[in-house]
């Protein structure tokens, strides 16, 4: 689950 969050955050930031 965390991997998905980090992926989105990485794309945004």
UniProtKB/Swiss-Prot annotation:
Tissue-specificity statement: Expressed by the skin glands.
UniProt keywords, alphabetically: Amidation, Amphibian defense peptide, Antibiotic, Antimicrobial, Cytolysis, Fungicide, Hemolysis, Secreted
GO process terms (BP): defense response to bacterium; defense response to fungus; killing of cells of another organism
A GO term from the CC aspect: extracellular region
Coiled coil segments of this chain: none
Organism superkingdom: Eukaryota
Location(s) in or outside the cell: Secreted
Main localization (coarse): secreted
Disulfide bond annotation, renumbered to this chain: none
Modified residues (Phenylalanine amide): 13
Job description of the protein: Antimicrobial peptide with activity against Gram-negative and Gram-positive bacteria and fungi. Also shows hemolytic activity.
Protein known as: Temporin-1SPc
Organism of this sequence: Lithobates septentrionalis (Mink frog)
């Amino acid at each position: 689950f965390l991997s998905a969050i980090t992926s989105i955050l990485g794309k945004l930031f």
